[in-house]
A protein has these predicted regions:
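Structural signal for well-ordered, non-membrane alpha-helices
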Residues: 15, 19-26, 58-61, 87-94, ...
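Basic/polar N-terminal segments that are highly enriched at the extreme N-terminus
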Residues: 1-8, 20-26, 162-170
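C-terminal or internal capping secondary-structure element at the end of a domain, subdomain, or sheet
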Residues: 123, 127-168
Length: 170
């Protein structure tokens, strides 16, 4: 399996998880107020964690697929807005051909807002930058929602795994 195929499958699965978590949050008694929740005072709120989770996918697809994507950096203002952005990212992932990504040893160069610049091979970018960034923000979403009292657990986080279920267990 190519690094591109692995990354796209991961994004497809885990964007599904993000959508599931956001849907459950939208049904919670605290409502839209949850969007302002944060784990610690110096951490970003839920709405930003959701936006950054989606942005990690979009940025990776743009850097590796050269699709010329313009990021929506506006704040998420509602769960409906969050779900629409997740849906758009899922559609983009589904439409991406892994063969359009560069060779695994192609150089990817990028700068981050604090002024640091990086250069690494495409597979290293995917493995060492894009994937950890994606999971960091996704786990922050999950953790904030747990902290706020949502009844979620591992089955909610790994719901996509049910497509591999076989019965009865051996």
């Amino acid at each position: 399996m190519s690094y591109a195929s692995a990354a796209l499958a991961t994004y497809a699965n885990m964007l599904g998880t993000l959508d599931h978590l956001v849907r459950k949050a939208s049904e919670h008694a605290k409502g839209e107020a949850l969007l302002q929740a944060r784990m610690a005072e110096d951490m970003l709120p839920l709405h930003t964690q959701i936006r950054f989770t989606v942005a990690q996918v979009n940025v990776a697809l743009d850097r590796l697929g050269s699709i010329g994507l313009t990021l929506d950096e506006s704040e998420i203002t509602s769960f409906a807005d969050a779900r629409a952005r997740i849906a758009a990212a899922r559609e983009l992932v589904a439409a991406t051909d892994p063969a359009s990504w560069p060779a695994s040893d192609a150089t990817v160069e990028f700068d981050v807002p604090n002024g640091m610049g990086f250069a690494m091979q495409a597979h290293e970018y995917c493995r060492d930058w894009a994937t950890p960034q994606f999971y960091f923000h996704l786990m922050s979403v999950y953790s904030i929602l747990r902290m706020e009292g949502l009844a979620i657990g591992k089955a909610d986080y790994l719901g996509y795994i049910m497509k591999y279920l076989r019965q009865p267990a051996a």
